Amino acid sequence: LQSWGRAIRCETAEISNDTKALLFALDSVFGLIPRVLASYLLRPFASLIGEGALSSEGLTTMDFHESAARRPRAIGIACATAAVALGLAYMGVAGAPARYLGINLVALAIGMTLLGLVGRVMLAGPRWAGGTIAAMAGALLATALLGDDVDGAVRWVRLGGLSIQPSLILLPLMVVAFARCRDALATAGMIVAAAAMAIQPDRAMAGMLAAGLGVLAVMRPERHLIAALGASVASFAATLVRADTLAAVPYVDQILYSSFDVHAAAGAAVLGGSALLLVPAIVGWRRDPANRDSYAAFGFVWLAGIMAAALGNYPTPIVGYGGSAIIGYALSLLALPKLTGAGVGVDAQAAGEAETTPLDRHLLVGAA
């Protein structure tokens, strides 16, 4: 911004008429105000694209946007943080208990911590993706068999007095990871997960599973993928046959509509926060054609979650009360590439790869 200030001063000095010079200076300053605001608003996320990104010697705001667009995980962190903030604004206006707001904030911190820690493990051993998917499927099946029963639905486990929904935490990551790892073990894991959703039963999560696998099958039909899709469709059909009698929970279910009864701004916050969840998929789809499978799965998984919340008494992801979806969204970012290769050469890609290790160190700082 200092360079812009010097340019304005030089241009003003060349204008002989004092009135015109003053008007030019004022017009230029007003034009810079949006850049100044953007610079300060984006500063918490500067660590995601490198130190000094917003300094006078570093990137301009436009450069920041360009660099951030090549980092899907960084975009996801920013969107998750903003969506949680909008959800907190809604709950605050709606009169939700302060404990609800605190739980969502803690869930965001946990999600970002896991994103940083687990991200390093995945870099060290990506070959274990199939086994990881199978292990998560086992956890979902255990929940269906041993979890808390609420009006015939067995979707939750209790930890320290809190109920968490493992399917909201694990299933999005499983689907997006399956876009990049479709071996026999991963396929078996997806089939077990589909069975778990039918046993629970959980219509919303079964629909999320079918939506994510469906878009993958359309983009790249393969034997393992078709088998997993068939199981997910059967699971979703099974949940449709069984009645879902759970009542709506305040600040959790149906808030895409009820928020407008509180205030128009509260409704706009809920809708805006929900839309932010899809931004990483949209940006990644346009910027990184080589990994479109992952972005499509990510986008359809969370779109299905939002649609389920709109159509029935199911949790509204991120913007409603509940930490499971917040943690699940953060974990699902693990399956997205850290750095896209769009618009960069071989040397720049190598430099970008070198940046991925320090990027992990800054995930929590950027999220704060």
Give the predicted meaning of each segment.
Residues R155-L168, Q254-A268:
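Short aromatic-rich membrane-water interface segments that cap or initiate transmembrane helices
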Residues V283-G299:
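Membrane-interface helix-loop-helix junctions at transmembrane boundaries of multi-pass membrane enzymes
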Residues C181-A195, R203-A237, Y329-L333:
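Hydrophobic alpha-helical segments of polytopic membrane proteins
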Residues A193-L216, L240-A247, F260, L311-Y321:
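Helix-loop-helix junctions and helix-breaking kinks within/between transmembrane helices
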Residues L331-A368:
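A juxtamembrane structural motif centered on a specific transmembrane helix
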Residues C10-K20, A25-S39, F45-I49:
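Short, low-complexity, charge-dense intrinsically disordered segments
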Residues V106-G111, A265-I282:
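Hydrophobic alpha-helical transmembrane segments
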Residues G76-C79, A83-T187, A194-Q200, G312-P317, ...:
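Membrane-helix boundary/helix-loop-helix interface segments in multi-pass membrane proteins
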